[in-house]
Amino acid sequence: MDPRDSETRLFRRIPLGGEVFEWGTDVAHVANQIPLRPWVDEMDEDTESVALRFKGLDTWDVAELLEALWGGQSRAVAACVAALPSLGRAVEAASRRLAAGDGRLVYAGAGASGLIVALDALELEATFDWPRTRTAILLAGGLDLSHGMGSRAEDDANSASARARDLELGPADVVLAASAGGASAFTVAIVQEARRARALTVAFTCVANSALGRVAEHVVIAATGAEVIAGSTRLGAGTAQKVLTSMFSTALMVRLGFVFDNYMVNLRPENAKGARRGVRMVASIARVDENAAAQAFAQHGDIKRAVLGLAGLSRAEVETALGDAGGNMRTALARLASRRRAEP
């Protein structure tokens, strides 16, 4: 069935460049249905190009302005489709490295790209209980943003190299580096140091054949083209990098066994909302009511242990089961079921 004929649409009607286009749910059609003319002109080649389509933008009314901005965001998301194969290869390579030992996930970048990857890094602990000791952030200018971004640091390759060496990177580590234009001297220098240390390197950029792409082992490119406001890569390029880095880390955590079905069973409940979410997950997975789930959750302290406890294991048996399964709840439950089937 042609997805464009489906009654279920990703978006019903999307205005782009003064025309209305309909998108289907199939991602291949999303990329194909983004109009290249008049949206893209002869100068619309990279993130620093000027799209003549938006000449006079400052005179447009708010509705036209928002339509243009929405079109830029939509086109950026659609540009991610072509990056999925390279993204998949990067996820597989990273999961092999990180599953084999205690390697770290190192995030590097400058400016808006650096902030995007830093945000992804900071979410890992609460969402997936990824150890803080296995996460590092190399943001140009540092993480103290109380006095602004410190944009000059983007050009400081020497500082980048020194900070990367201070981490004592090695073959067990994975370095995720982002630069919209692929030209940040800070980010390129970190990847070069990582390659020397034989760490796995994954670059996220929005330009083909960039300096960053040439030095990284895996390159994930979303060719977002010129921005609605020329050079403002916090717009379309930033959106594409947020989409792709979030997909990378999420798929990576799934591959590492931190997700059961589509539940984030490694969730660390640090507030009331997280605790309620944890109880609901336990109830759904263990197929018990929320009162029983809440009791098990309170007794065992986390989702996976509560589920295994509700399966009839003592606290000591829960620890043994999870330890033998490398923390993977699906493996632990499967082994428990197999053992019980074998019992007379």
Residues covered by each model-derived region:
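A short, well-structured juxtamembrane/interface segment
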Residues: 82-99
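Short, positively charged patches
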Residues: 48-52, 88-92, 104
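Residues at the C-terminal ends
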Residues: 99-100, 196
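Short, amphipathic alpha-helical interaction segments embedded in low-complexity terminal/linker regions
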Residues: 252-344
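Gly-rich Lys/Arg/Thr-decorated short loops/hinges at beta-loop-alpha junctions or inter-strand turns
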Residues: 47-48, 68-76, 136-147, 260, ...
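Glycine-rich phosphate-binding loops that contact phosphosugars or nucleotide phosphates
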Residues: 2, 17, 105-256
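Cofactor-/ligand-binding subdomain signature composed of acidic, glycine-rich
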Residues: 5-79, 83
